[in-house]
């Protein structure tokens, strides 16, 4: 978990790979269709002409780079208006691909403080599109608390609600669709083959609000996993 970013971390266990199947390219096309532009990731200024990827050749090359797990830095950057986010793929095991959709905290909180709620909605919209289009087993926005490990996800050992949560169809069956549907939340809807649960929109930028705590008590009682103190140290 990076203290410089807000990370939505998702786990895909469905084959073929989201890269070789063309699903990742389709996701990028969806983002560009609603006004996002791919950039080279140079932060200031994001909109500089030299930072924009204009041609299909440049975009295809950026996607191939993001899908090349032999490369250390595989980040795909997207931007529109006052909001930007990035996608990062990894393959922790032969059968699992993780994708992380993240935003830089300095841009999210400080670029324009009056737009923090708008940025939260932009982030949620980007996540919603991604979980709708990619075969996602589970996903969560890790802010104050560590996400579950790959092993915990594959074993269905989910014991916390985060500010944004996605449960794929297999987890819905394991945990119980009716139980998840009845969890108190600002947003609790079907997306793709799974369920998207956002206990409190404000929690995306405020952390553990009382609504998130209530939703956790409803689903999991008082037994919760380890947290961090904001500096990466385990409490």
PLM feature spans:
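C-terminal interaction module
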Residues: 2-4, 10-34, 147-235
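Hydrophobic beta-strand segments of well-ordered beta-sheets in folded domains
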Residues: 4-9, 41, 135-141
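A common structural junction motif
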Residues: 26-38, 133-138
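Short, intrinsically disordered low-complexity segments
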Residues: 34-98
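Short helix-loop boundary/capping segments
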Residues: 98-164
């Amino acid at each position: 978990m990076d203290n410089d970013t807000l990370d939505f971390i998702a786990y895909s266990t469905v084959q073929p790979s989201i890269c070789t199947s063309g699903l990742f390219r389709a996701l990028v096309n969806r983002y560009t269709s609603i006004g996002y532009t791919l950039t080279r990731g140079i932060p200031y200024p994001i909109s500089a002409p030299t930072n924009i990827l204009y041609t299909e050749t440049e975009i295809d090359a950026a996607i191939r780079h993001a899908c090349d797990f032999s490369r250390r830095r595989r980040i795909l950057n997207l931007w529109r208006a006052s909001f930007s986010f990035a996608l990062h793929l990894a393959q922790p095991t032969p059968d699992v691909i993780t994708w992380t959709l993240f935003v830089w905290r300095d841009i999210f909180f400080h670029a324009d403080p009056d737009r923090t709620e708008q940025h939260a909605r932009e982030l949620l919209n980007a996540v919603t599109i991604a979980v709708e289009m990619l075969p996602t087993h589970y996903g969560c926005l890790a802010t104050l608390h560590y996400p579950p490990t790959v092993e915990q996800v594959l074993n269905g050992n989910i014991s916390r609600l985060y500010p944004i949560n996605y449960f794929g169809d297999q987890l819905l069956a394991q945990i119980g669709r009716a139980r998840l549907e009845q969890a108190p939340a600002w947003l609790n809807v079907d997306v793709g083959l799974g369920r998207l649960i956002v206990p409190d929109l404000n929690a995306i930028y405020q952390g553990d609000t009382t609504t998130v705590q209530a939703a956790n008590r409803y689903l999991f009682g008082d037994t919760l996993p380890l947290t961090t103190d904001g500096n990466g140290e385990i409490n």
